[in-house]
Swiss-Prot record:
Species of provenance: Schizosaccharomyces pombe (strain 972 / ATCC 24843)
Site (Important for acyl-CoA specificity): 258
PANTHER family: HOMOSERINE O-ACETYLTRANSFERASE, SERINE O-SUCCINYLTRANSFERASE
Reactions it catalyzes: succinyl-CoA + L-serine = O-succinyl-L-serine + CoA
GO biological process: cysteine biosynthetic process; cysteine biosynthetic process from serine
Gene3D superfamilies: alpha/beta hydrolase (3.40.50.1820)
First and last residues of the transit peptide: 1-26
SUPFAM superfamilies on file: alpha/beta-Hydrolases
Region Disordered: start-end pairs: 49-70
Listed name of the protein: Serine O-succinyltransferase
Comp. bias (Low complexity): 57-70
Enzyme nomenclature, EC number: 2.3.1.-
Family listed: Belongs to the AB hydrolase superfamily. MetX family.
């Protein structure tokens, strides 16, 4: 009897399996959303091809914005800036040549008669020149609360200049710009650039503005790297330097994070080796890369207080798409950014950050590289050089390593300069310049040891005017983004910067 019943159950189960799964397939609305965006792009591109004078296909495709918590004010800036045009060939550190370039910039305050009150404000990776609102662009800037009459960067006293860095996409020449050689987007034909190259371009802007010496150079994150670099390349052109959440060289953890973001982006099939400008952009890779970046921009303690391990809606079944509050936050951060910034600019500028190293040996290597490549510029300036020769001059020689990853034991390595001694020598040009270095203990992207090392090496290089500030976890748990966050009840960055700038 029991045996017969068992056989009937087995037969019923076999019949069930033939016609129906034991469980329904999960739904993936986040995947559907990405596919729908691609479909919208493809439809818009088809319409644009049929009607060439139609609007940019990305204009009608929107992403949600973040509304909860203190968040940076970043946006896609397409107007309201001035332009500096450099119409001569520009040799980059790694041998590439730009036939000409443009730098977008904005200014606040009034330049005094002897042009001695100018502050150059350097941006982070994805920021535009729009640090503060003005009549030509009334939208709030990314440092809106820090700049203005009587504020931390006081425009009653100072003439503030903010540029969009070389390689970016908000008015300055970058991969999305048109190559004058063939009238097409540079894409990944744009040359590899360094932080030093960014500074050389900015110095040419200062020449154009007839500013021989800045009152101060101020920057955070990538901007902090630029600020220090300006002081090292042209110490005679700056009176004081503020570097916030930056450093004199990139940390391996930071390099690893940015490398991961680039790999995610480059493996989006729509990236197409950088040639996506006439097609669908790599929006999914860009979104995921931004989510990884956002993890590095903030801190665990803040998120524990803000999100904990709470689900967005406990009444629904768990899902692989955004489910926990922290997941929905990351998803929104990625959505907000994925169509605002050029993916190739992210590749180029993040790589420049990775290569940032102010040690004496590295700077010497770059200098030797420039001398070695000077013949390219000379040939470029020659009237009889052909287009084919120019392409050959800039030919890429990068290859994968012959040997896979290997951990090299310290005793087997070729002799190298002591890192700290090397960095001290590299920072020697700054020994007579007052420098403020600020770090944040909760910073995951640029660990506070980077700022401690920078201040320590400046002092050992003979600089007796180093001011060091470190915000501990009780003062700020906002991580790397601390420099972007303004709170009336907390003196995070602004008050310390104001005191340094106005110190006689």
């Amino acid at each position: 009897m029991l045996r017969a019943s068992s056989k009937r159950l087995q037969l019923s189960w076999q019949v069930f399996r033939r016609f129906q799964s034991s469980n329904p397939q999960l739904s993936f609305p986040c995947v559907d959303q990405a596919q729908e965006r691609s479909r919208q792009f493809e439809q818009s591109l088809q319409k644009q091809q049929a009607c060439p004078n139609s609007v940019d296909p990305s204009a009608s495709i929107t992403s949600p914005s973040l509304s909860s918590g203190p968040e940076p004010v970043y946006g896609k800036i397409v107007s309201g800036f001035k332009k500096f045009y450099h119409n001569k060939p520009f040799l980059c550190d790694h041998g590439g040549i730009l036939p000409k370039f443009e730098i977008a910039y904005e200014t606040w305050g009034t330049l005094n008669k002897d042009h001695s009150n100018a502050i150059l404000l350097h941006t982070g990776l994805s920021a535009s020149s729009h640090a503060h609102s003005h009549p030509e662009n009334t939208a709030p800037g990314w440092w809106e609360q820090f700049i203005g009459p009587g504020k931390d960067v006081d425009t009653n006293k100072f003439f503030v200049i903010c540029t969009n860095v070389l390689g970016s996409c908000y008015g300055s020449t970058g991969p999305s710009s048109v190559d004058p050689g063939d009238g097409k987007h540079y894409a990944t034909r744009f040359p590899i650039i360094t932080v030093n190259d960014m500074i050389r371009a900015q110095l040419l802007l200062l020449d154009h503005l007839k500013i021989e010496k800045l009152y101060a150079s101020v920057g955070s994150s990538l901007g902090g790297m630029q600020s220090l670099t300006l002081g090292a390349l042209a110490p005679h052109r700056v009176g004081r330097i503020a570097s916030i959440s930056g450093g004199a060289r990139s940390h391996p953890y930071s390099i690893a994070l940015r490398f991961t973001q680039r790999q995610i982006l480059m493996n989006d099939p729509y990236w197409n080796r950088g040639f996506y400008y006439d097609g669908v952009p790599p929006h999914t890779g860009m979104k995921l890369a931004r989510e990884v970046a956002t993890i590095s921009y903030r801190s665990g303690p803040e998120w524990e207080q803000r999100f904990g391990n709470r689900r967005a809606d406990p009444s629904v079944s768990p899902a692989f798409c955004p489910d926990f509050l922290i997941e929905t936050y990351l998803d929104h951060a990625g959505e907000k950014f994925c169509l605002q910034y050029d993916p190739n600019s992210l590749l180029y500028i993040s790589k420049a950050m990775d290569m940032h190293d102010m040690s004496a040996s590295h700077q010497r290597s770059l200098s030797e590289n420039r001398k070695k490549n000077q013949h390219k510029l000379d040939k470029y300036l020659s009237a009889d050089v052909s287009a084919e020769e120019i392409i050959k001059l800039n030919e890429d020689t990068s290859v994968l390593p012959d040997v896979p990853y290997q951990e090299i034991a310290n005793e087997d390595r070729a002799p190298e300069p002591d890192p700290e001694t090397n960095l001290i020598a590299g920072l020697a040009p700054l020994k007579d310049t007052p420098v403020m270095v600020m770090g944040v203990e909760s910073d995951n992207l640029m660990p506070v040891e980077c700022q401690r090392e920078t201040a320590r090496c400046l002092e050992k290089a003979g600089n007796k005017q180093v001011v060091y500030h470190e915000l501990d976890a009780n003062e700020s748990f906002y991580g790397h983004d601390t420099f972007l966050i303004y709170r009336k009840d907390l003196d995070l960055v602004g008050g310390k910067l104001k005191k340094f700038l106005e110190l006689s």
